Amino acid sequence: MGIKDFRPLTPVQRFTSLDDFSDITKTEPEWDLTEPYKKKGGRNNYGRITARHRGGGHKQRYRIIDFKRDKTGIFATVEAIEYDPLRTARIALLRYDDQEKRYIIAPQELKVGSRVVSGPDAPPEVGNSLPLKNIPSGLPIYNIELVPGKGGQLVRSAGSSARMMGLDKEYAIVKLPSGEIRKVCAECYATVGQVSNPDHFNKSLGKAGRTRWLGWRPRVRGVAMNPVDHPNGGGQGKSKGGGGWQQLESPWGKPAKGKKTRHKRKNSTKFIIERRPKKKKKK
């Protein structure tokens, strides 16, 4: 997969960099592994906006992904690497030796014709899924379970990977892409490798319309709003509401720009060995 730049025949093309889709081997999805995807426009079951700036976008179908990898001991052959419009990573179509087909999130080095398997006896090779206790230290992993048998929940976006650091009794120690080091139950499954499509974050959409095709609406700055609409709204000129200096906040009043907002007595805190590092301030 690579990034394609355009000759600046128009002002938009001057700033556009998109996927060249050279890693895609099949254009049409496996229809039996898809289902209708009804857009909610960011609304919940009450009809109230809970996710701002969502709406519109091209019609899509949801690809049913096997996050559990619970078909253990049966080898599968990679039939195709496909594009998924609802996620940043590529997906791989597997055909198992018993002729069942499933989609998985494709790792970076997986090719058509590769053989993969899941289970406690699977070798720690790219694309194979096995318990954390059986994965050697130092290997990159993704699609990590938090609860055994629930399916992968961590590290699923394009280009991401965690790193297995070792074992501590019944827990595995994993370093996440954010830099956080935490304990995960050693019985949880993970897939060996790095998620495909690492150049996703080098794309430049070039124009607002392409963002709308993806289902994103315009994002208005809080300081440009009225006080009734945002804690940072109002004021004279470009100042924040209330006159002088004011802490930057989210629309719901939570402090932004560095202040910790995590609940102090959250149950999962005991599994975190080292918090993710703070972002360095730009000079």
Swiss-Prot record:
Protein name stated in the entry: Large ribosomal subunit protein uL2
GO biological process, one term: cytoplasmic translation
Homology family: Belongs to the universal ribosomal protein uL2 family.
Basic residues bias locations: 256-268
Lineage of producing organism: Bacteria, Pseudomonadati, Verrucomicrobiota, Methylacidiphilae, Methylacidiphilales
Gene Ontology molecular functions: rRNA binding; structural constituent of ribosome; transferase activity
Record's subunit section: Part of the 50S ribosomal subunit. Forms a bridge to the 30S subunit in the 70S ribosome.
Coiled coil start-end: none
Statement: the UniProt record of this protein carries the keyword Ion transport: no
Region (Disordered): 34-53, 224-283
Cited InterPro entries: NA-bd_OB-fold, Rib_uL2_dom2, Ribosomal_uL2, Ribosomal_uL2_bac/org-type, Ribosomal_uL2_C, Ribosomal_uL2_CS, Ribosomal_uL2_dom3, Ribosomal_uL2_RNA-bd_dom
Compositionally skewed regions (Gly residues) per UniProt: 232-245
Database matches in SMART domains: Ribosomal_L2, Ribosomal_L2_C
A Pfam family: Ribosomal_L2
GO cellular component labels: large ribosomal subunit
The protein's role, per its UniProt record: One of the primary rRNA binding proteins. Required for association of the 30S and 50S subunits to form the 70S ribosome, for tRNA binding and peptide bond formation. It has been suggested to have peptidyltransferase activity; this is somewhat controversial. Makes several contacts with the 16S rRNA in the 70S ribosome.
Keyword RNA-binding: yes
Keywords on record: Ribonucleoprotein, Ribosomal protein, RNA-binding, rRNA-binding
Cleavable signal peptide: none
